[in-house]
A protein has these predicted regions:
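Conserved ABC ATPase signature
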Residues: 142-146, 150
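ABC ATPase NBD coupling module
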Residues: 66-82, 112-120, 233
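Helix N-cap at the start of a conserved alpha-helix in ABC-type nucleotide-binding domains
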Residues: 178-180
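Helix-to-loop junction immediately C-terminal to a conserved catalytic motif
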Residues: 49
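Catalytic Walker B motif of ABC-type/P-loop ATPase nucleotide-binding domains
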Residues: 167-170
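Conserved catalytic motifs of ABC-family nucleotide-binding domains
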Residues: 163
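Conserved ABC ATPase "signature" region
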Residues: 64-65, 108, 112-137
Length: 265
């Protein structure tokens, strides 16, 4: 389970990008995060995997406080967080199998990684997941020869090879056509159920969020202002999520006496 409490991210002296944000994602739950550009959706995901350092607050994954980890402990924790990217983040000149096995780099020695001599168990696991998502027949094909949907499937398998405790997906369908987008969203949902994995998806397509996720979180300029079932996301909720400006929200925060961040005691 992912538990986020009073998360704040501030760049320099600017207004926080994330403002006292709290969120829980249980196992076997697919949660989508929607909101206008600049709402803080991508920053939230990057704080979870510590690609961006939180300013304050706590992020716990299965009882481990990720914000307190440093060095080797942080590297080990990152191995357990699978990340799926909008731009796929594949090494184009490498084969599908080589890209997939890169998900095991944190588990093998430097020499094994350098010479791509992965244990047979890793290779077997790679074939298992490639068959599951329908790309096993592309194992020896270069990544730059694949379609967008095929590349994203490679990205999904690479994340699964990390043996993750959670999957984070940052706009996983933004570069895909509508049919392929639906296939990828359906795949993420089924994998969550099969592997008892929590999945947190940053997504712009509200229709896909309503069709393929268990819960929708609506963000507006650093705050969560909607958190509920897809069926409860009505026009009024949509207007609240996508209306306004940062200036309007700052004025509303001041009028309501809402703090931008909690000062640790």
């Amino acid at each position: 389970m992912l538990q986020i409490t009073n998360l704040v991210k501030r760049y320099g002296s600017d207004e926080p990008v994330l403002k006292n944000l709290s969120l829980t994602v249980p196992e076997r739950n697919v949660v989508s995060v929607i909101g206008a550009s600049g709402a803080g959706k991508s920053t939230l995901l990057r704080c979870i995997n510590r690609l961006v350092e939180p300013t304050s607050g706590d992020i716990e994954l299965n009882g481990v406080n990720l914000t307190k980890l440093r060095g080797g402990q942080l590297r080990h924790a990152r191995q357990r967080i699978g990340m799926i990217f909008q731009g796929f983040n594949l090494v184009e000149r490498l084969t599908v199998m080589e890209n997939v096995l890169s998900g095991r780099l944190g588990y093998v020695s430097f020499l094994r990684a350098a010479f791509r001599r992965f244990p047979q168990a890793d290779i077997d696991r790679a074939f298992h997941f490639m068959e599951r998502v329908g790309i096993a027949h592309y194992a020896n094909k270069r990544a730059d020869e694949l379609s967008g949907g095929e590349r994203q499937r490679v990205g999904v398998v690479r994340a699964l090879m990390q043996e993750p405790e959670i999957l984070l997906a940052d706009e996983p369908t933004a570069s895909l056509d509508p049919k392929t987008s639906e296939q990828i969203m359906a795949l993420l949902r089924s994998l969550s159920e099969e592997l008892s994995l929590p999945v947190l998806i940053n997504i712009h397509n509200v229709t896909e969020a309503k069709a393929y996720t268990d819960r929708i979180v609506g963000m507006r300029y650093g705050r969560i202002i909607f958190d509920g079932a897809p069926t409860s996301l009505d026009e009024a909720a949509m207007d609240e999520i996508y209306a306004g400006t940062p200036v309007d929200d700052r004025a509303a925060d001041q009028a309501a006496g809402r703090p931008l961040e909690t000062v640790p005691s």
